[in-house]
């Protein structure tokens, strides 16, 4: 489907020269003098190469329709990440470039949304929250619990975050998958 360049947004998938690209960022620039342009940063899905393109805002670009489907995470190996569709039991392999910063939060059996073009995954969406265990943090200091200061902690997936003083090593906590920030102590 052909659309004007100014309507392209982050996460869209474009086809250019027979190759698929996922949009990382799109910005419309309106200089005081001259023609407005759309600055678009993209990543080629096939090999992960990043490119930057400039289009006039009225130029036509080929936008590809993608389908979002739920998949369960199975495992990771040297070739990539493996997911299974719960209804059909079809398995799909996703490259490290597509998974990107979501990799540390993937847990066996976790249901994620994969944006698919034909049989190729082009993007991944994690659940908003994940439950992880604190594997290393400073011990609780008496009298420090009244202040609203946070202390550094390392989670079971290797991510570093800030936690309240009452959280100790071995405690399971809920974090946002978007940035790894602390939400609450896990209820389980």
UniProtKB/Swiss-Prot annotation:
Keyword set, alphabetical order: Cytoplasm, Elongation factor, Protein biosynthesis
Localization in the cell: Cytoplasm
Record pathway: Protein biosynthesis; polypeptide chain elongation
Any single GO BP term: peptide biosynthetic process
SUPFAM superfamilies named in the record: Nucleic acid-binding proteins (SSF50249), Translation proteins SH3-like domain (SSF50104)
Primary site of residence: cytoplasm
Pfam families: EFP, EFP_N, Elong-fact-P_C
Keyword Protein biosynthesis: yes
MF (Gene Ontology): translation elongation factor activity
GO cellular component annotations of the record: cytoplasm
Family stated for the protein in its record: Belongs to the elongation factor P family.
Functional summary from the UniProt entry: Involved in peptide bond synthesis. Stimulates efficient translation and peptide-bond synthesis on native or reconstituted 70S ribosomes in vitro. Probably functions indirectly by altering the affinity of the ribosome for aminoacyl-tRNA, thus increasing their reactivity as acceptors for peptidyl transferase.
PANTHER family named among the record's database cross-references: ELONGATION FACTOR P (PTHR30053), TRANSLATION ELONGATION FACTOR KOW-LIKE DOMAIN-CONTAINING PROTEIN (PTHR30053:SF14)
Name listed for the protein in its UniProt record: Elongation factor P
């Amino acid at each position: 489907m052909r659309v004007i360049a100014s309507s392209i947004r982050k996460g869209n998938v474009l086809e250019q020269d027979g190759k698929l690209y996922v949009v990382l960022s799109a910005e419309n620039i309106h200089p005081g003098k001259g023609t407005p342009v759309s600055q678009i940063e993209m990543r080629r899905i096939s090999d992960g190469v990043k490119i930057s393109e400039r289009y006039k805002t009225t130029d036509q670009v080929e936008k590809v329709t993608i389908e979002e489907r739920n998949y369960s995470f199975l495992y990771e190996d040297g070739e990539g990440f493996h997911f299974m569709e719960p209804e059909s039991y079809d398995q799909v392999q996703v490259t490290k470039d597509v998974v990107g910063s979501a990799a540390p939060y993937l847990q066996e059996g976790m249901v994620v949304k994969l944006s698919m073009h034909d049989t190729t995954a082009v993007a991944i969406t994690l659940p908003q929250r994940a439950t992880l265990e604190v594997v290393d943090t400073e011990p609780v200091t008496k009298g420090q619990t009244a202040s609203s200061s946070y202390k550094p902690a390392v989670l079971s997936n290797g991510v570093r975050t800030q936690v309240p003083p009452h959280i100790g090593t071995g405690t399971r906590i809920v974090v946002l998958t978007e940035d790894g920030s602390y939400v609450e102590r896990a209820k389980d």
